[in-house]
C-alpha cells in the first residue's frame, strides 16, 4: 500500500503556545505524553485522535483542544476529521465545524500545521474525557 500521508508531532514550542492559548497553562509535561493518531483495528475507517489532557465539559460547553499533531500529505490530498459515531450518538459531542478539513499545504503553515479540534457538549449531562483516550473508551 502506498503511503500518501504521515502524522507527526509539532515542535514542543508550538504545542506549548497552543496549549497556553487554550488552557492558560504550561504544556511542557503534556507534550511528552502526546501520541500519534492510530487505527483501533485493522478494519477501522480512520485514525483516532486523543485528547492530550483530561477534560470535563458541562452541558452546552465548548472546548478548543490542541492535538499537538500535524500531517504531511502528498499534494492534492486532504485530511477530513469526523467525530467517531459514538461521540454524537452516545455522548452528543459534536465538532463545531461538522467536518474538519486539513489541506495538504497546511503542513507548511506558520503554526507548523498544528491541528486543533473544537468540540461542543450538546447533551444535558456533563461529559468526561480522559487524557490519551478517545471518548469511545470512557
State the predicted function of each range.
Residues 1-135:
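Non-catalytic terminal segments and appended small domains
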Residues 138:
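Conserved AMP-binding A3 loop
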Amino acid at each position: 500500500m502506498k503511503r500518501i500521508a504521515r502524522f507527526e508531532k509539532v515542535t514542543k514550542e508550538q504545542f506549548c503556545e497552543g496549549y497556553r492559548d487554550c488552557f492558560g497553562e504550561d504544556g511542557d509535561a503534556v507534550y511528552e505524553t502526546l501520541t500519534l493518531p492510530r487505527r483501533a483495528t485493522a478494519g477501522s475507517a480512520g485514525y483516532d485522535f486523543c485528547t492530550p489532557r483530561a477534560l470535563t465539559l458541562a452541558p452546552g460547553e465548548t472546548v478548543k483542544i490542541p492535538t499537538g499533531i500535524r500531517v504531511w500529505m502528498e499534494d492534492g490530498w486532504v485530511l477530513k476529521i469526523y467525530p467517531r459515531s459514538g461521540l454524537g450518538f452516545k455522548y452528543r459531542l459534536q465538532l463545531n465545524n461538522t467536518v474538519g478539513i486539513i489541506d495538504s499545504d497546511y503542513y507548511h503553515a506558520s503554526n507548523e500545521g498544528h491541528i486543533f479540534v473544537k468540540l461542543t457538549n450538546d447533551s444535558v449531562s456533563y461529559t468526561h474525557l480522559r487524557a490519551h483516550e478517545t471518548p469511545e473508551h470512557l
